[in-house]
């Protein structure tokens, strides 16, 4: 029995007695116990109190390394008896021990107590290790799942804290009094050496208990043997490494100039579907469409939106099953669409520059993809990409015919235009020369009349301000002449023609000359009717017509209009 001071147990320093006893039982089904029994002789509580110290709190790894150990499941107990014997033991302690009154004595007692506890813990760990090794040496290889020690769950910092758990308070007292006395330094040095020995011993024990054979070594040996067999047989082997590596997603740089960057990021994780997955998704989509058609029929019959209970009753299922079917069908539809977005992008790129930007083309292509997913029947034996390709292309072309032209063309004309372009391109690649209209009509199956209508259809408008030329430094408005512009040559020709007409009209009578000039607007640029001319001249309308006819007969004479023939040739 030795006097000590333990802050963990609330007892006077000179009245605390410690008894260590360890009991090991034979390896039977009922496991034995290891007892740690400190007794306090100054407690005044009338009842027998038993406090439990868990092994995990002491952090003794030798008890946790083997799940089949006879003592790993037990707890450490200490009993504190109270009763009539307390006073007698207290008097004996007073007679045999000396009270610790000075600070130096307190420090020495604390150091001695910590050393005793550390030695006891080391002894118990050694005994437990020897007992475990003598019990069954084959337990290490029986089950690899149970060989992992809880010691690995703690970091180096936590291990150091666990090993110093029993003497935390003592270390604080010693560190405060380390400069008080030379004798205290010697005690502290002994305490630290004992703790260092305990740390080394406890760190060696987990390394021994964790010597479990890894399954990766067996896998590596099997792969090496397989590689040697392939080498011996002449088959080149591919080096895959010591362990299967997971595919790493390389973080690609975001191209902010890409108009479809957000769409690409959304669909980058989606994979291509297998035939089996397409069958499953198609079945889920068809079930969803069936339920939606049933809801539409109920709406038409009742004139209002049916409740969920009515919908479930009409479908012949309960509400929970109906909700699950709707949710499953929606997920199938979303997965089918997301997995084929890349197909839409590849088709939409072929129609760039036709009057719509790429984002709008992809949007219209997605509408065609949704339509194709709803109409797809996997039982026909075709892949979904083959079937949806035509729906996507049709949606893109229809949007181009409706939105890309200022002068809208019928959809059948747009389709014929695409057919003519494809036939012309194919014939040129085969023959190396531009095909004739007859060859194009034969390749497309169109009549010549229909082909000419397609070729004469309005072309997409172009801006007069867009850049053209090799260096993109010209505009169409700068190089295209205005067909309505009047040139100086035209002005000169008109002036000569006016003079020649005046000479011809001078050969007519006065009334005939005046009627012709009023009739064709040669006075003020406005052509007058026979009635207006008759009122101005004070004659009837019929008389004006007779005067006009007489003037035309005279003008048809070749002698008068011979020098006017040159203007007819110039106009033609």
Curated annotation (Swiss-Prot):
> Where does the record say the transit peptide is?
1-39
Induction summary: Induced by red light, especially after dark adaptation. Moderately induced by blue light. Induced after two days of imbibition.
Q: Which UniProt keywords apply?
A: Chloroplast, DNA-binding, Plastid, Sigma factor, Transcription, Transcription regulation, Transit peptide
Show the CDD domains listed in the entry.
Answer: Sigma70_r4
What is the annotated tissue distribution of the protein whose record heads this document?
Answer: Highly expressed in cotyledons, to a lesser extent in leaves, sepals and siliques, and barely expressed in roots. Present in seedlings.
| A Gene Ontology molecular function term of the record | sigma factor activity
* Subcellular location, record wording: Plastid, Chloroplast
Task: Output the PANTHER family linked to this UniProt entry.
Answer: RNA POLYMERASE SIGMA FACTOR RPO, RNA POLYMERASE SIGMA FACTOR SIGB
User: Which InterPro entries does this chain map to?
Assistant: RNA_pol_sigma-70_dom, RNA_pol_sigma70, RNA_pol_sigma70_r2, RNA_pol_sigma70_r3, RNA_pol_sigma70_r4, RNA_pol_sigma_r2, RNA_pol_sigma_r3/r4-like, RNA_pol_sigma_SigB/C/D/F
- A GO term from the CC aspect: chloroplast
The listed location of motif Polymerase core binding is 360-373
* Function of the molecule: Required for the transition of plastids into chloroplasts by coordinating nuclear and chloroplastic genomes under light conditions. Sigma factors are initiation factors that promote the attachment of plastid-encoded RNA polymerase (PEP) to specific initiation sites and are then released. Promotes the biosynthesis of plastid-encoded tRNAs (e.g. trnE-UUC and trnV-UAC).
Tell me the Pfam families matching this sequence: Sigma70_r2 (PF04542), Sigma70_r3 (PF04539), Sigma70_r4 (PF04545)
Protein name per UniProt: RNA polymerase sigma factor sigB
Q: Where is this region: Disordered?
A: 215-249
The superkingdom of the source organism is Eukaryota
Gene name of the encoded protein: SIGB
Entry coiled-coil feature ranges: none
Plastid found in the keyword field: yes
What family does this chain come from, according to its entry?
A: Belongs to the sigma-70 factor family.
Q: Some GO term, biological process aspect, for this entry: which one?
A: cellular response to light stimulus
- Asked whether the UniProt record includes Isomerase among its keywords, one would answer no
Q: What happens when the gene is disrupted?
A: Pale green seedlings exhibiting a strong reduction in plastid-encoded tRNA levels. Aberrant chloroplast development; normal etioplast in darkness, but abnormal chloroplast in light characterized by small size, poor thylakoid membranes and stacked lamellae.
The residue ranges marked as DNA-binding region are 530-549
């Amino acid at each position: 029995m030795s006097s000590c001071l333990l802050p963990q147990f609330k007892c006077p320093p000179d009245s605390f007695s410690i008894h260590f006893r360890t009991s090991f039982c034979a390896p039977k089904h009922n496991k034995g116990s290891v007892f740690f029994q400190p007794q306090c002789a100054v407690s005044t509580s009338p009842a027998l109190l038993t406090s439990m110290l868990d092994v995990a709190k002491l952090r003794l790894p030798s008890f946790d390394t083997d799940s089949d150990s006879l003592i790993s499941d037990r707890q450490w107990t200490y009993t504190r008896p109270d009763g009539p014997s307390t006073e007698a033991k207290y008097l004996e302690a007073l007679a045999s021990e000396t009270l610790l009154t000075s600070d130096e004595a307190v420090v020495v007692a604390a150091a001695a107590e910590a050393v005793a506890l550390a030695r006891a813990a080391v002894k118990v760990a050694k005994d437990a290790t020897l007992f475990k090794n003598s019990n069954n040496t084959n337990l290490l290889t029986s089950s690899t799942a149970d060989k992992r020690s809880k010691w690995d769950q703690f970091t180096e910092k936590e291990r150091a804290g666990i090993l110093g758990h029993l003497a935390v308070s003592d270390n604080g007292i010693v560190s405060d009094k380390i400069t008080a006395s030379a004798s205290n330094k010697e005690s502290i040095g002994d305490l630290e050496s004992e703790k260092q020995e305990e740390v080394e011993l406890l760190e060696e024990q987990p390394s021994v208990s964790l010597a479990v054979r890894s399954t990766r070594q067996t896998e590596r040996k099997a792969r090496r043997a397989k590689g040697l067999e392939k080498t011996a047989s002449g088959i080149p082997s591919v080096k895959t490494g010591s362990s299967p590596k997971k595919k790493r997603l390389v973080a690609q740089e975001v191209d902010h100039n890409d108009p479809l960057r957000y769409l690409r990021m959304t669909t980058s994780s989606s994979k291509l579907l297998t035939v089996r997955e397409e069958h499953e998704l198609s079945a889920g989509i068809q079930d969803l469409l069936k339920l939606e058609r049933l809801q539409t029929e109920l709406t038409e019959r009742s004139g209002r939106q049916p409740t969920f209970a009515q919908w479930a009753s009409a479908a012949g299922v309960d509400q929970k099953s109906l909700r699950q079917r709707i949710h499953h069908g929606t997920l199938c539809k979303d997965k089918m669409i997301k997995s084929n977005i890349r197909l839409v992008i590849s088709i939409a790129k072929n129609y760039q520059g036709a009057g719509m930007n790429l984002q709008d083309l992809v949007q219209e292509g997605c509408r065609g993809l949704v339509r194709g997913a709803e109409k797809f029947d996997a039982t026909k034996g075709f892949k979904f990409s083959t079937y949806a390709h035509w729906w996507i292309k049709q949606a893109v072309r229809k949007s181009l015919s409706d939105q890309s032209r200022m002068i809208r063309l019928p959809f059948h004309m747009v389709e014929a235009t695409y057919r003519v372009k494809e036939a012309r391109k194919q014939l040129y690649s085969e023959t190396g020369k531009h095909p004739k209209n007859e060859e194009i009509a034969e390749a497309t199956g169109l009549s010549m009349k229909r082909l000419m209508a397609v070729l004469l259809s309005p072309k997409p408008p172009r801006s007069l301000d867009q850049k053209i030329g090799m260096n993109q430094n010209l505009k169409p408005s700068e190089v295209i002449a205005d067909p309505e512009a009047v040139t100086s040559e035209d002005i000169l020709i008109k002036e000569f023609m006016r003079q020649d007409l005046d000479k011809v009209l001078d050969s007519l009578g006065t009334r005939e000359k005046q009627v012709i000039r009023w009739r064709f607007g040669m006075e003020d640029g406005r052509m007058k009717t026979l009635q207006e001319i008759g009122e101005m001249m004070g004659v009837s309308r019929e008389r004006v017509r007779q005067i006009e006819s007489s003037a035309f007969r005279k003008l048809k004479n070749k002698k008068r209009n011979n020098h006017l023939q040159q203007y007819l040739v110039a106009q033609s």
